[in-house]
């Protein structure tokens, strides 16, 4: 039995849920999200709560049970409060700028890296070495953050690169003579 899947999702005030078989549409003060689920699960609305139940007793249904519940919970949280990620850029001369709908990264390469900003994500740059990402879709926000980090992942010797704000980078000692 899934420990995550069996928990009901309480729908807060100001959030509307629309169910159409396995398609879930959730709208709230921050925006609207929809997702179609596959698999052997049933999504049921009971009073002010959403309940996800498996339809079969096989491994696929059990694994989708908890996953679907977590995705729906993140959708409800996203349209109500939104999600924020903070990225840190470490390195001499490393910086970020927003120009139009592109994020321009200067990361000690022969060229500047341009990344198109998705329409549902907002970027704020309080400093040149800090990137604040905001959005209602947790999955898309994480994917976009990983695209940014891939441009210059943190290296273990000097700690240069782009990383999540509170992520610890294991440092290595350099070569000895």
From Swiss-Prot:
GO terms for molecular function: rRNA binding; structural constituent of ribosome. The keyword Nucleus does not apply. It comes from the Bacteria. One of its GO terms (cellular component) is ribosome. Gene3D superfamilies: Ribosomal protein L6, alpha-beta domain. The keyword Ribonucleoprotein applies. InterPro entries: Ribosomal_uL6-like (IPR000702), Ribosomal_uL6-like_a/b-dom_sf (IPR036789), Ribosomal_uL6_a/b-dom (IPR020040), Ribosomal_uL6_bac-type (IPR019906), Ribosomal_uL6_CS (IPR002358). Pfam families: Ribosomal_L6. One of its GO terms (biological process) is cytoplasmic translation. Keywords: Ribonucleoprotein, Ribosomal protein, RNA-binding, rRNA-binding. Part of the 50S ribosomal subunit. Belongs to the universal ribosomal protein uL6 family. This protein binds to the 23S rRNA, and is important in its secondary structure. It is located near the subunit interface in the base of the L7/L12 stalk, and near the tRNA binding site of the peptidyltransferase center. This is Large ribosomal subunit protein uL6. The lineage of its organism: Bacteria, Pseudomonadati, Pseudomonadota, Alphaproteobacteria, Rickettsiales.
